[in-house]
Amino acid sequence: MSSLGNLANTGLVNYISFCFLFFVLKFRYYPENGLTWMVAFVVLSFVIQLIINIYLTSLPELCGQADFNIAIYATIVPWMAIFVLFSVSLSIFPGWLRLFSNTFGSSAAYMYGLKETMDKIFTVENRTDAERDQTNFQLLKALDSLYSDRDTLIQELDISDVFFNEKGEIVWKSFTGTLKMLLLTAEIEQSTLKDLYYCILLKDNVAFFVWFMLIGILSVLVSTNTLMNEGCSTKKGGAFDIIFNRT
C-alpha cells in the first residue's frame, strides 16, 4: 500500500511542477487574460496526466504492462467532469478570481512594484493641484480616503478595455476616466501606465495559478484513485484484487 501511495504522489508532484512552470512562462510571454492560454493549459495538463497514468499502469504494483484503456478512462473522466467544467465556470464567472487576486495576487503585485507605481500616479504635486480649487468638503474627504487606501481602487480597476495602439502606447480609457473622477488631470507617463497594467495582470495570473493548482490537485487525486480501483483490462486481477481478496 505504501508503494502505491508513493506512486499516487507522482501525479501530484508532476502536476504542481507543471502548473508553476506554465504560469511563470505565461506571465513572461503571454500575461493577458483570455481563453487561448486556458485551452492550452487544459490540453497540456491532460496529456501529461495521461502519460503518467499509462506509466503507472505499466508498473508491477498495478497492471504490469501499459494499459491504455484504463489510463485513458481514468484521465478523461476527471478532466471532463472537473477540469473542463471548472474552466468554463471560471470564464463565465470571472468574479471568482477576486478570492485569490485580492489576497495572494495583491501580495505578488506589491512585490512586483505596485506600491512604487501607484506612488508615481498619486504624487503629492498631482494631489495638491487636484484639491487646490475644491471647496466641497465631502468630496475632499472621499478623495482623502481613496488616496490613503489605494487597495480599494486597485481591486476595482477594469483592464478589459486596455489595448495598445499602432505606436505601442497603452490606451486605458476606464482608468483615465477614474483619474478624472479623482481630479487627477496630470498626464501619466506611458511606462507608469504599463507598469500598473502588468501589476494588475500579475494579480489575475496568481489567482488563476492558485485556482488551477487546487482544481488540478483534485483532478489528479480522482484520476489516480480511479486508476488504482478500476482494475486492469489487460490482465485479470491486480494489486488491489490481491489486497482485498477479490476474485
Spans of features found by a protein language model:
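N-terminal first transmembrane alpha-helix
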Residues: 1-109, 199-216, 223-237, 241
